[in-house]
């Protein structure tokens, strides 16, 4: 909190007075010098590394799910594409009839994850350095074709990347960095303007470097440590001035009239797109409140390995999931951080917003 962190309060005051240029003008030299002094290796940060950086406005990734338009974050984040692919692959199934207390639903959800993440590992990265076939990856025809790989009766032996329209470079899949240290919040103001915001410093306390009241990130670890395989480049390999791939999936859902009906997102590294898609399915297909949807258990496919939330309803489905082919399955203690706002329209037309936070965490959210 700024009141307990005098250096941070001073930084916020400077930003309020000078705007974001404060980072690039007044702070740049001291910032670079501090980082360089704490970095004994070659390739130390210099002032030009700070002053040459520019935040970029990027196009959202949007797709249709049932009667809704779902928009999320594009590359270098993989979240928007992954959410769109998972939802699109599941659209041919009657999820409403299955419900959240069905082993079949969780099996189908796992399969959609595997297929979406296979594409993610191969294609997703910084578009300034590698052509990412975003339009092809979320094209309804491509997603429908990928959906045909999903069987309600049997798990895939192995999920492999597809070949969407627009592929220009032969790539190789990289390794999967471990991501955490992320924050997400959602806001809707009195005029209906909505923000779904995800930010991260990667690891817990980032790099551990503390400057002017805030921690600095260690996002370098979000790159693939393998630059190439079999002579083919990895999309998320390390390169100078490149932005690493992330899993962030801030999402806004619109109805057919173009009105915002759900604002959602999460923290939690590679589980973020899964948490987000799960919440959307909960509201759209299962008719749950946002709080109930956010509270649904987590199940995640890390390649052939499946982990699910310990003590959840999924625990009772473990044997069934094994019979379906998910043989490498185990429980874990979930520490999830999703939240959402859902529009609620009363009979008299009055609009309010339901506030939802993950029940597995302590902080309270409010609607005023």
Language-model regions, residue ranges each:
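Non-catalytic, conformational "gating/processing" segments within enzyme and secreted inhibitor domains
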Residues: 1-40, 120, 127, 154-160
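Internal maturation/activation junctions in enzymes
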Residues: 5, 43, 92-200, 331-332
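Active-site rim segments in enzyme catalytic domains, especially the processed small/beta chain
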Residues: 38-46, 188, 193-257, 262, ...
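Extended C-terminal subregions enriched in glycine
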Residues: 191, 241-244, 276, 285-333
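Alpha-helical support elements that line or immediately flank enzyme active sites
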Residues: 17-24, 29-35, 88-91, 266-288
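Structured, charged N-terminal subsegments at the starts of enzyme catalytic cores
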Residues: 33, 37-111
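Short, small/polar residue-rich loop motifs at catalytic or cofactor-binding pockets
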Residues: 57, 179-182, 246-248
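Short, well-structured alpha-helical segments that form the helix of a local strand-helix-strand
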Residues: 26-32, 101-117, 290-300
């Amino acid at each position: 909190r700024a009141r307990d962190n005098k250096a941070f309060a001073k930084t916020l005051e400077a930003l309020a007075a000078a705007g974001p240029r404060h980072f690039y003008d007044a702070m740049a030299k001291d910032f670079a010098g501090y980082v360089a002094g704490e970095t004994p290796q070659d390739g130390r940060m210099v002032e030009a590394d700070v002053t040459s950086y520019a935040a970029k406005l990027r196009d959202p990734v949007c797709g249709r799910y049932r009667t809704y338009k779902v928009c999320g974050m594009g590359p270098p984040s993989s979240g928007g594409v992954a959410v769109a692919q998972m939802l699109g692959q599941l659209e041919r199934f009657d999820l409403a009839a299955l419900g959240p207390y069905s082993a079949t639903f969780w099996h189908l959800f796992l399969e959609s994850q595997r297929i979406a993440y296979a594409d993610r590992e191969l294609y997703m990265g910084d578009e300034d350095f590698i052509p990412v076939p975003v339009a092809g990856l979320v094209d309804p025809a491509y997603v429908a074709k990928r959906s045909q790989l999903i069987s309600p009766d049997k798990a895939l032996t192995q999920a492999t990347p597809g070949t969407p329209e627009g592929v220009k470079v032969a790539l190789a899949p990289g390794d999967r960095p471990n991501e955490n240290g992320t924050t997400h919040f959602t806001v809707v103001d009195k005029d209906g303007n909505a923000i779904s915001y995800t930010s991260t410093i990667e690891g817990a306390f980032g790099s551990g470097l503390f400057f002017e009241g805030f921690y600095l990130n260690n996002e370098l670890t979000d790159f693939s440590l393998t630059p190439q395989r079999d002579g083919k480049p990895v999309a998320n390999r390390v390169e100078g001035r490149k932005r690493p791939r992330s899993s962030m999936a801030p999402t806004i859902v619109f109805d057919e009239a173009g009105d915002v009906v759900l604002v959602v997102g999460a923290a939690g590294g590679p589980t973020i797109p899964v948490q987000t898609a799960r919440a959307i399915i909960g509201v759209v297909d299962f008719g749950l409140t946002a709080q109930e949807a956010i509270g649904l258990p987590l199940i995640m496919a890390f390649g052939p390995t499946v982990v699910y939330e310990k003590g959840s309803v999924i625990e009772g489905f473990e044997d069934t999931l094994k019979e379906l082919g998910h043989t490498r399955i185990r429980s874990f203690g979930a520490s999830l951080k999703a939240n959402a706002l859902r529009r609620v329209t009363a009979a008299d037309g009055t609009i309010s917003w339901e506030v939802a936070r993950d029940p597995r965490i302590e902080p309270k959210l409010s609607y005023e």
